[in-house]
A protein has these predicted regions:
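Short acidic, glycine/serine/threonine-rich helix-capping segments at coil-helix boundaries
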Residues: 2-36, 87-90, 111-115
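Intrinsically disordered, low-complexity segments enriched in small/polar residues
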Residues: 1, 5, 21, 157-160, ...
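Acidic, glycine-anchored loop motifs typical of Ca2+
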Residues: 10-13, 17-18, 113-115, 168-209
Length: 211
C-alpha cells in the first residue's frame, strides 16, 4: 500500500483501520472506469471512436448507445472490427455489421466497395443503414434486431421471431439462438450473444483511456 501511494504511516505489519482504508482506496482506484472510453475502444482507432459517438448521437440513441453499437459490431465482426471480414457461412455478407449484397445495393454500394473501405469509412454506411430506425434504437436488443430482424425493433423481449411450428425452415436456420430449445426463438434469446459481447467489451482490458 505504501509503494502504491495509499499509506504513508509507519509500517508495522498489523492490519488496522488505516490499512483497511488504504486498501479500499486502492481497490476503488483500480476498479474506477470513469477514465475509460466506450466498450471495445481498445480495438479501434480514436477516429473510429469519435465517429461512433457522433453516429449514435445522430441516431438519437441514449448515452449507452456507443457501447451498444460497438458490442453489435464486435459480435458481427468476430471482435475484429474489420471492414473486410466475410461471413464464414458463405452468405456474401461483409464488414462491421455484415452487410448482405442486397443491403449494400439498397445503400447505393456493393459489398466489394464496402470491403475496400477503411473501418472508419465504412461507418458512414453503418449510419446510413440505421437511419430509418432513428429514435427507435433504445436498447441493446433493439439495436441488434435492427441488424438481424428489423421487424422486432421496439417489440417486447419475449417477442417470437422464429417459430418452429409456423416457419420450420427459418427456425432451423436460426435454431442456434433458441437457448431453451422450446421451438421458439425470442428477441431476448437472440440478443443474449450480443449482451455477452457488451459485458466483455466493458472490461477495462478492452477499453482505451479517454484522451
Amino acid at each position: 500500500m505504501s509503494e502504491a501511494g495509499f499509506y504513508n504511516g509507519k509500517i508495522d505489519g498489523i492490519w488496522g483501520p488505516k490499512s483497511e482504508a488504504a486498501y479500499n482506496a486502492f481497490i476503488a482506484r483500480e476498479t474506477d472506469t470513469s477514465n475509460l472510453d466506450i466498450a471495445w475502444s481498445a480495438k479501434v482507432s480514436p477516429e473510429f471512436i469519435q465517429r461512433v459517438k457522433m453516429m449514435c448521437q445522430n441516431l438519437k440513441m441514449d448515452e449507452n448507445g456507443p457501447d451498444y453499437m460497438m458490442s453489435c459490431m464486435a459480435w458481427e465482426s468476430g471482435e475484429t472490427f474489420s471492414s473486410k471480414i466475410k461471413n464464414g457461412a458463405g452468405s456474401g455478407a461483409v464488414g462491421l455489421i455484415q452487410f448482405m449484397p442486397s443491403t449494400a445495393k439498397n445503400l447505393g454500394t456493393t459489398t466489394e466497395a464496402l470491403a475496400a473501405m477503411t473501418p472508419e469509412e465504412q461507418l458512414e454506411y453503418v449510419e446510413k443503414y440505421f437511419k430509418p430506425m432513428k429514435g427507435k434504437l433504445k436498447t441493446l436488443s433493439d439495436l441488434y434486431m435492427g441488424i438481424l430482424w428489423p421487424k422486432a425493433v421496439g417489440k417486447a423481449e419475449d417477442y417470437v421471431m422464429f417459430d418452429k411450428a409456423e416457419a420450420p425452415t427459418t427456425y432451423r436456420q436460426n435454431s442456434g439462438v433458441d437457448l431453451n430449445k422450446d421451438g421458439k426463438c425470442t428477441k431476448a434469446e437472440a440478443a443474449a450473444c450480443v449482451m455477452n459481447k457488451y459485458n466483455k467489451g466493458m472490461l477495462a482490458v478492452n477499453r482505451r483511456v479517454k484522451i
